[in-house]
Amino acid sequence: MLDDAVQPIAEFQNLRVTFQTKSGEVIGVEDLSFQINPGETVCVVGESGSGKSVSALSMMRLVEFGGGALAGGQLRLRPEKGGQLDVVNAQPATMRKVRGNDIGMIFQEPMTALNPVFTIERQLVEGLKLHLQLGQGAARARALELMKQVRIPEPERRLKQYPHELSGGMRQRVVIAMALACRPRLLIADEPTTALDVTIQAEILSLIDRLKQETGAAVMFITHDMAVVAQMADRVVVMYRGRKVEEGPVDQIFQAPQHEYTKALLAAVPRLGDMRGTSYPQPLPLLGAKAQAVEPIIGSDAPLLKVKNLVTRFDVSGGFFRRTVARVHAVEDVSFTLQKGRTLSLVGESGCGKSTVGRSLLRLVEPHSGEVEIDGEILGDMSAADLRRARAKMQMVFQDPFASLNPQMTLMAQVAEPLRSFGTHKGAALQNRVSELFDQVELPRSFLGRYPHELSGGQRQRVAIARALALNPQLIVADEAVSALDVSVQAQVLNLMMGLQANLGLSFLFISHDMAVVERVSHDVAVMYLGRIVEIGPRQKVFETPQHPYTKALMKAVPIADPAKKQLDRDLQFKAIPSPIHALDYIPEPSVYTEITRDHFVLQTHCGY
C-alpha cells in the first residue's frame, strides 16, 4: 500500500458533467482524469468554456447548484482526518463540512462571492466560528490576522466596511482571506488574480505558494494566464472544449508542447519586453492565425485632452450626526496631455486613483479642483447642457460589460440608445448606423436581436465598444476593458481597438494594471501611486529605463511566461500602501517633477513609496 504522504489528496477519474438546456443536453466536461498530490500545484489552463471551472465545482459538489449533473466518473478526496471520501456519492451534510475545512475555494468574481448586506468582519467571523468553533473574540482576532496576511491597508477599518465600499482588488483579497481561513488541505483557486494588479498578484501567488509549502496543502489553480502558470505550476492540465488535451510537468509544457492548442495558447501571451526597441503600438498574435501586418499607429502631435492639477477627494462621514470628519485624497495634483490619435495608459494598483481620474475627466465624479480641457473647451466652466454636448466627444468602456449592458434590452436597442438620446439618427438611418457599428467591431449583424446573456465575454465587450463609438467620439476612456478576458479574446479586442484607432483617429486613455498589455497598446504611459503620477513619458522610455522605485517594483512584479524565471519571495519587497485618508486640515505638497530625458518626467515629491 502506498505511504499516506504520497497518496493524492484529490483524484478526478473519467469525470463527465452535463447540463440540461432547452436545446438538449450540453456536455461541460468529458472523460477528465488527473490527480493532485500533497504539496503540489496543478494548474488547469484553458479559455472560457473549456470546462476548467466546471471540473473544480464538481469536486466541491457545487456544480449541481448551477444546473449541472455528475453524469459519470469518480471524484475522490482524502480529508485531513484520514480515509477517502467518495465525493460523487457523499451526503449534502458531509459536503457542507468538507467545504471550507478540507477544500477552500477562491472565486474569480469577489462581488458575487461576498454578501453585499453584511460587513467584511461578519462574513469572515461566520466561517471561522462555524468551522473552527472559535469564540467571537478569537474569531475576530483571526479575521484581523487574515486581513493583514493578504496585505489590506487599515485592516481594522476594512473589517467594518461592506463589500461595495472596497475596490475590486481589496474585495478579492477578502475572498482569498476567507478561503485561507481554515487552512484547507486542498485549495481551489479559480482565476484568483485575474482582476488584480501585478504587485498584488505577485504577492497573492507568493502567499498561496507559501501556504502550500507550510501546510502540505495541494492547490488546483485555474487560470487562462500562461505567465501565472509558469510561476505557480508543478504540473499543467490543458483543457479545450471540455476535454483534457495535454498534461505534463510545467517545464515540458512550456519547452516542448505537443498539442496545437497548447502551442497556440503560448503564442498569444503578451510578454513584457517583446516591444523593446519599438516606439509605437503593435497588434498581438491571434490563436490559430497570423497577425496581419499593420502600419505603425503614430498619431498626431496636436493635443486633444489637457489635464492640469486635477484633484478629486471624497468625504468620510463619522460621528453621531454623520458629519464629514476626513477626506479620501483619491487624485492629487495630476497633470498630463493626450494627443489626437494616441494612447496614454494609466497604470497602478487598486486604489491608486486611476479609475477616478477617468471618471473625473467625464465629470461622472466631480473633481475638487483642477482643469480639464478637451479639444479647446474647458469642462469645468460648462453648463449641464454644454457638458452633455461635450460628452458626445468622450465615451467610456467599462471593465465588466455584463454590468454596463442592460440585460433586458436587445443589443440593437442598446447601441442605438446614445443615437436616439442625442437625436442624431432616426428610422432607417438609425438601423444602418447600428449595423455599421457592428461591422466596425467585427460582430455579425445577426446579433442585433440578441440579449447580453447570449454572448461571450469578448463579444459583450465588443458591443460596449460599439456603443462607445456610436457618437463618433474623439476620446475613449477604457477602464480595465480587457482585464477579465481570455488571452486570445483579449488579443482580438486589443487588436480591434488599435485598428479603430488607426482608422478613426481615436485617442484612448487606457486604464490597466496589466503591464504586458500596456506595453503593447501605448504611445505614452503614466504610472500612478496613491493618487499621484510618479512617472510619465513615452512608453519606450518608461518601460526600458524606469526611474521611480515604484515603477521598478511594478516591472519586477510582472509574471514572466517562463518556468525558469520564477519570482522568488525575496524579490517581492513591496511597501505597505499608506492610507489615502487625511484630516480636513491636511494640505498635501504640490507635485514637483524632474525631466530625465525629453518628455520623461519623474516625481520628486514624497508620495509614500
Spans of features found by a protein language model:
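Conserved ABC ATPase "signature" region
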Residues: A138-R157, I378, A428-S446, M555
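ABC ATPase NBD coupling module
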Residues: K81-G104, L130, Q252-P257, F320-V325, ...
